[in-house]
Amino acid sequence: LALFLGLVFSFYSISAFAQIRDAEIAKDDQNGQWLSYGRTHNETRFAPFEDINDSNVQELGVEWYIDLPNDVGLVSTPLVVDGILYFVGTMNIVRAVDAVSGEILWTYNPRVAEEIAGKKKVGWVHNRGLTFYGDKVYGATWDGRLFALNHKTGEEAWITRTFSIDTPLYITGTPKAFKGKVVIGNGGTENGPTRGFITAYDAETGEEAWKFYIVPGNPADGFENAAMEMAAETWTGDWWKNGGGGNAWHGFTYDAEMDALYIGTGNGAPWNASIRSPDGGDNLFLSSVLALDPDTGEYLWHYQTTPGETWDYNSNMDIVLTDLEIAGSTVKALLHAPKNGFFYVLNRENGELISAEKYAEANWASHIDMATGRPVENQGARFNNNTKITPGPLGAHSWHPMSYNPSTGLVYIPTIHWGVQYNDEGYDGEFTSNDFEPNLAVDWTEDLDYEISGSLQAWDPVGQRQIWEVGYDHMYNAGTLTTAGNLVFQGTAEGSLMAYDASNGQTLWKKDLGLGISAPPISYKIDNQQYLSILVGWGGGGAAGLDRDGSTLGWAYGRHTRRLITFSLGGDNEIPSQPAPSFPEPLVDTGFQIDPNLAILGETAFANNFCGGCHGTAAIPAGMAPDLRASPILLDQQAFYSIVRDGALVSRAMPSHPDITDDELESIRHYIRQQAINAQRQ
């Protein structure tokens, strides 16, 4: 009888839950929920709630918070479905939380550390989010698995591998669910000879439905479809030997009106187009907005933002859909602000360019020719004479999502202001490992004349002009949320959650959260109460130390607690204070005799094994991993070898490098010790 009653209760509990399908995701109100990465299929990140508004936002207080002491970089967008908040943290661990009280209901650990042990060298700890469809939560792991979870219990409904773990590919992106399917892509363009693709799976069973490759393969093997045959005409040389790239690691939008799936595609592999495709060519479908049939994966149309891409100007940024009034007509518009510094408005019915203007510094091209839809490149932009180019490879806008407010008609873009020096001297055209290899000489450590900064700008997509801008001292600030309360929310690299007047950019509220913020906020309503939630945990490329900017913030590894924080009007809880920003003191041991020749070799070994991907370029970290210059582990040869080669700290997201040699390990030790001395001298 007890078993029978339990089954009956379970049946009625599950039946009471209204499954989430495309119609629910498409609704503006969504009954107060946040059902998808960009809230609706249109990816606007607009919350149509006005309880919290420009007249009372200063009354926001902490409703509840959760400490996440074992997490590192937090960059994901939470979901809120039926009163439960779902989010993904470090190493793809998923948690379900009561969205009103903050109580953790269940945790799912896909055990990424164990999966990648001895197989993957680059230990990314980030993921940008989950998706919800039907009655399941979907996520993906860095090592390439796609999973579906029971939304009530967190138990696996199914899990499947989307690529071999032995390839250079990885996943940091959010799956996209629509029409009974779940789509996922992958990254890895810089990690080896990759040929990007996206795959759709049956949402109920996990069975593969279709796959679309983004660049053509070896013509001798035949082409998968007519689109690949067409694309191959735009490549030269033996491009397939280096893969070609194009990886779709982010930027999926489903258009229910057009019944189309839009994919933002990646940059070339290797970066340098003169090596990748020596006799020129546009190299389709790199750096493009690609429209596919959502049922079959068949090609519909494309628009390429950067033909013959060579600067890491991918188009993986979010794709936003809306209707715009242009010249007296309603246009079904697609809005896109990729890395290359131009803001594009496309007609999503056919992919035709409506307008394009610079939204940031971009000296690689003068303008977009409206007759051809192509950029007009400036002389010397393609690595000539160590040219300094804007934007740099991190782009004028990265993955940090922009938002669109239909009331103001404005797009709110987290913008990066930065340039680097490109050249192709000393280029090595061979990928040597599954580690990060841009394969062109971009000196990330060189001090350039360009200032590094960031900004939030409000952009008019109809007039193609900036309406207002707020400047920041640092470039890697978080994605945005805009609301019907005439507000724009954004977290900053310096650790503040900001609320701005959506119309004029006036600062209305500021809350110091004690740690750099990389994740975008969300808003939801339960029982007529509006909430604002955000993950606080400095992450992404800024925290990895890929550039010098992040290392100046003082978010030292292990000192600052990561958190999920939820606010409400009149919230009266207090979050514990965080330590002040700090910079670990480099450890100098006079008993360690540095061999200068080994240190020189160690610089190369440090780069080739992508140690800098977590510990910072030139061993100058930015918070995602310990400062090795201050670590006593470097003084203990056996302990250092055990961690780096044998994986003694795999459970803490430090990957093992089983193939690294004693000579490489020793040279890295000497290089880091040399960097410690150099830091002390400064």
Locations of the language-model features?
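Blade/loop signatures of beta-propeller domains
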Residues: 20-62, 218-228, 374-377, 445, ...
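Repeat-blade elements of multi-bladed beta-propeller folds
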Residues: 34-38, 71-93, 119-146, 170-191, ...
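Extracytoplasmic beta-rich repeat domains
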Residues: 66-77, 107-131, 156-174, 213-251, ...
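Short, conserved, GDST-rich strand-edge loop motifs in beta-rich repeat architectures
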Residues: 184-196, 236, 263-283, 417-449, ...
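Blade-level signature of beta-propeller repeat domains, shared across WD40, Kelch, NHL, RCC1
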Residues: 522-582
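Sequence/structural segment immediately N-terminal to covalent heme-attachment motifs in c-type
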Residues: 594-617, 642-646
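Gly/Gly-Pro-rich "capping" loops immediately C-terminal to redox-active cysteine motifs
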Residues: 616-649, 653-656
